Design a protein with these regions (language model features):
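Terminus-proximal functional modules
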Residues: 1-67
């Protein structure tokens, strides 16, 4: 899991901006996240996978953070 500091940076980023580069805790996935209508969608940069989250907490718990 990411540090509390990085998790807080991720939360703060999306309070100010609707779009951001993302990295996964495994180090194997990178993507771009867009926040619309309070939901978070991450498009994987390596393939066509898309990950959707209802909350920021769910996104963080799944191992994603701002890059």
């Amino acid at each position: 899991m990411w540090t509390e500091n990085l998790q807080q940076q991720t939360k703060e980023h999306f309070k100010q901006y609707p779009l951001g580069p993302m990295k996964h805790f495994t180090g194997k996935k990178y993507g771009v996240c867009i926040c619309e209508d309070g939901k978070y969608t991450i498009a994987n940069r390596s393939n066509d996978e898309v990950y959707e989250y209802e909350t920021m907490e769910a996104l963080l718990e799944d191992g994603w953070a701002i890059d």
